[in-house]
Amino acid sequence: ATETQNEKVKVKVETVSVQDVEQLSEFTATVEANIKNNIAPQTPFRIEKIFAEVGDHVKAGQLLAKMDATSLKQAKIQLDNQEIEFKRIDELYKVGGASKSAWDAQKTSLEVARETYKNLVENTQLLSPISGIVTARNYDSGDMYSGGNPIYTVEEIRPVKLMVNVSESLFTKVKKGHEVDIRLDVYGDEVFKGKVNLVYPTIDPATRTFPVEIKIANSDERVRPGMFARVTMSFGHMDHVVAPDRSIVKQSGAGDR
């Protein structure tokens, strides 16, 4: 045998160990508003005045826009007349001077007039149904609203929510209240805390996943709808055999083997 053949290969022995490894899964999602309301009247009106601008914070019940009040004024006159007429019929009915059918007919007319007036009040003064931020305004004062785009969009962003699709294999492990870590590309490695708010009860047979809704309190409003998010969920710890990375020899062209 040659000297080269007799040369022994030097081998360094490394010790493998069992370590407690956290079981993590990562998901991606787009941030959504907790509630999104499109605000517009039920029927066409001219917009008399706009009171809020994009970016404004508004409270529930705050006046956003005032529509032309011509129809409202006419409805108020009709309501007043119906109330007067009903009072007259009611007094006659009590003394036998009017029939029950006449009394019923007038009462129905009064109720219709009241409902019409109430509906016009709600559609003449547009109020925000939620506290939030104005994210869209599609009309100006003086414009004619005729349908299509809403006059305003208001979104509630305290909290915000994320929807992630989780593998069927984790169905029994995800529970309401489960705390998660969230990273947003715009904020780098900063971690935001969220909680599972809703676990959908069925599996999508096409993707073998189920939807999970996560909420972020977002009290400082730094997280905004549309941001790209990475969600990390922890599913406890398991013991795994761990070998030092330097002790692994990878074969060329063998991928991760």
Pin down the residues of each PLM region.
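Surface-exposed patches in structured soluble domains
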Residues: T30, P44-F51, H57-L63, L127-V186, ...
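Amphipathic alpha-helical coiled-coil/rod segments that serve as protein-protein coupling scaffolds
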Residues: V16, Q23, A40-N149, K161-M163
